[in-house]
């Protein structure tokens, strides 16, 4: 019996061992099969993502979305329509692999699971671009071609505008969420995955940014012009020849009325036709940022100073109130739009050139900014004639933009506007709160930074010398990360440089209207009445004497603190023989609206001289890369360089 039992135990042991071996073999086989399936899936995804990126890169989609001119915009949409099916073939396969059980289970692995999760986000975003967003764009383009944004009588087709905006907006919102999630995903550990995602993210970021610009423009147009009933808008035309914080001094103002899609332009009035009014209620930003006003000298309501604050909603309210107090004004303004000379030039790329009524001047997409900011003061010396020229040019360009919006013009407009709003050449504001939400989301309202996690510092300039010399100012900036701090915040060093390129010879030969007409006597009397100390008055008087010299420009600088962050170590260096150190280096802390600024009285620049403002910024913990906002320049895009010296 014992012998028999022993044999049974031995047999059982053999069976158990064999079962273990079989189990191990099965597990190993399953693991090998899973690993093989994972490797195969990874190769498929890598190949399809790489090909998707190549299709987007080589197809000209980016150029189509960013192009200007009616022909290029339509050709771009045709290119998108042609390439979308090819792109979908690759993105659908990649997304199918990433959504399969093999890839999903790999996403749960410790450490490297994030690699697979990030890949799934990337394939989702690429497929959304190919299968949802691009078809929405081409569908919208086809809708505009068939129905048009303008009816046969030239009036705006409100139904088409809102329909097109809604289609693209929904797809864009999905894409932006996916791209944000992808950018927030941890960096992959596996080199092959990391390389594929790096290429894919760069392509997606570029396409998503351009698509967001198109969607934002359509949303903004729908918010302002897509209503039933009547809307009345004030139009500000700013001149970059005389810099103000939001762009340039307001040179002419007109109205635009939209009545169930029917657009009509009112008369434009030059700033010289405006009366100075008693102080208006919305002067906080203007009084605190315009240097003379900070000394206690109130200008009251002056339409030229509406742009002295970089917070355009406040500027719009100021302009609305000043307009209402003019003999030709009204109390029925629903919103305010603003265009500077760079914007007017870009819009002529949409509408085509115009020849002014004199027959002597043709404004084009190449010469308008220079002519309106500089040449006009040389060619037309009579101020009344200048005023008439500005009134006519602004009215005709803006009217040409909005009238007869066929598909070609509409597509060109939505391709042109994002760069203009991004760089503060165009602003849009409505006094309707529901519209404000749309416009703020679209990024067209021109506000200083409002989000601690997306920090923005600003450098804003108000010209104090009554000159038209800012066409000759060349500006550049650098933003360098210098440290990643223990609390998760980051420190940056900002450098902002301005050079007066006007030569000493030009300062004596150019018209005085350009080189300066500073009213020394009047301003001296105003300063005497101010609350400044005797020492301050002496420094200010010295500055005003310098501003009376031809070609000397005075820039009051306001630095905006990012929300949740701080600004420190502000310094100014200058080689200008007319500099007044006490006025350029003393930065007063002020608050206008919800923004904290540090502002000086003026940096004075002689012809050929340069000044540089430098300061440090600390962001809120765990914030994104610091961005620099600034008063728009004479170029479409500001010259800003971002570097990272903290790593």
Residue ranges and their predicted role:
Residues 2-24, 34-638, 647:
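Non-catalytic, solvent-exposed segments at the cell envelope interface
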Residues 642:
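Acidic, glycine-rich low-complexity segments
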């Amino acid at each position: 019996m014992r012998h028999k039992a022993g044999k049974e135990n031995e047999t059982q042991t053999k069976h158990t061992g064999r079962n273990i071996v079989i189990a191990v073999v099965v597990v190993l086989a399953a693991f090998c099969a899973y690993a093989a399936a994972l490797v195969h899936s990874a190769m498929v995804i890598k190949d399809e993502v790489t090909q998707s990126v190549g299709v987007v890169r080589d197809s000209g989609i980016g150029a189509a979305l960013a192009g200007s001119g009616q022909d290029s915009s339509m050709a771009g949409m045709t290119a998108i329509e042609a390439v979308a099916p090819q792109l979908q073939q690759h993105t659908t396969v990649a997304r199918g692999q990433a959504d399969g059980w093999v890839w999903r289970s790999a996403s749960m692995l410790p450490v490297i699971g994030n690699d697979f999760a990030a890949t799934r986000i990337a394939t989702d975003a690429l497929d959304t671009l190919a299968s949802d967003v691009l078809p929405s764009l081409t569908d919208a383009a086809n809708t505009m071609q068939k129905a048009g944004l303008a009816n046969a009588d030239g009036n705006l087709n409100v139904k088409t505008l809102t329909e097109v905006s809604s289609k693209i907006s929904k797809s864009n919102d999905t894409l932006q969420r996916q791209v944000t999630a992808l950018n927030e995903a941890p960096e992959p550990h596996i080199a092959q995955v990391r390389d594929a995602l790096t290429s894919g993210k760069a392509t997606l970021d570029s396409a998503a940014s351009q698509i967001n610009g198109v969607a934002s423009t359509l949303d903004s147009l729908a918010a302002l012009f897509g209503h039933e009933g009547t809307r009345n808008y004030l139009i500000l035309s700013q001149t970059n020849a005389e810099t103000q914080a939001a762009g340039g001094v307001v040179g002419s103002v007109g109205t635009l009325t939209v009545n169930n899609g029917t657009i009509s332009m009112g008369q434009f009035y030059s700033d010289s036709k405006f009366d100075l009014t008693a102080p208006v209620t919305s002067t906080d930003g203007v009084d605190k940022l315009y240097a003379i006003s900070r000394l206690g000298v109130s200008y009251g309501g002056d339409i030229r100073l509406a742009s002295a604050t970089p917070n355009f909603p406040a500027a719009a309210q100021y302009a609305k109130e000043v307009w209402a107090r003019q003999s030709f004004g009204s109390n029925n303004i629903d919103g305010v739009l603003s265009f500077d000379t760079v914007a007017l030039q870009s819009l002529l790329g949409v509408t085509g050139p115009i020849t002014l009524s004199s027959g002597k001047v043709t404004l084009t997409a190449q010469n308008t900014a220079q002519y309106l900011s500089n040449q006009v003061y040389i060619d037309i010396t009579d101020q009344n004639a200048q005023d008439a020229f500005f009134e006519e040019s602004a009215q005709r360009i803006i009217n040409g933009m909005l009238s007869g919006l066929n598909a070609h013009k509409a597509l060109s407009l939505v391709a042109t506007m994002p760069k203009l709003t991004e760089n503060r050449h165009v602003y849009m504001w409505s006094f309707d709160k529901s519209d404000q939400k749309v416009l703020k989301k679209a990024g067209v309202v021109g506000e200083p930074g409002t989000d601690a996690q997306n920090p923005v510092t600003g450098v804003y300039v108000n010209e104090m010398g009554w000159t038209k010399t800012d066409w000759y100012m060349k500006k550049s900036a650098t933003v360098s990360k210098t440290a990643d701090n223990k609390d998760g915040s980051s420190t940056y060093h900002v450098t902002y440089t301005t050079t007066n390129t006007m030569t000493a010879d030009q300062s004596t030969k150019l018209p005085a209207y350009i080189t300066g007409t500073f009213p020394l006597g009047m301003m001296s009397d105003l300063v005497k009445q101010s609350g400044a100390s005797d020492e301050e008055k002496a420094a200010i008087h010295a500055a005003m004497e310098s501003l009376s010299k031809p070609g000397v420009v005075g820039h009051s600088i306001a630095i905006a603190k990012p929300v949740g962050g701080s600004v420190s170590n502000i310094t100014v260096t200058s080689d200008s023989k007319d500099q007044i150190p006490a006025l350029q280096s003393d930065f007063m802390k002020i608050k206008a609206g919800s923004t904290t600024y540090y502002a000086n009285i003026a940096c004075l620049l002689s012809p050929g001289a340069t000044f540089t403002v430098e300061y440090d910024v600390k962001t809120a913990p765990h914030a994104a890369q610091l961005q620099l906002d600034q008063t728009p320049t004479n170029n479409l895009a500001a010259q800003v360089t971002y570097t990272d010296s903290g790593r």
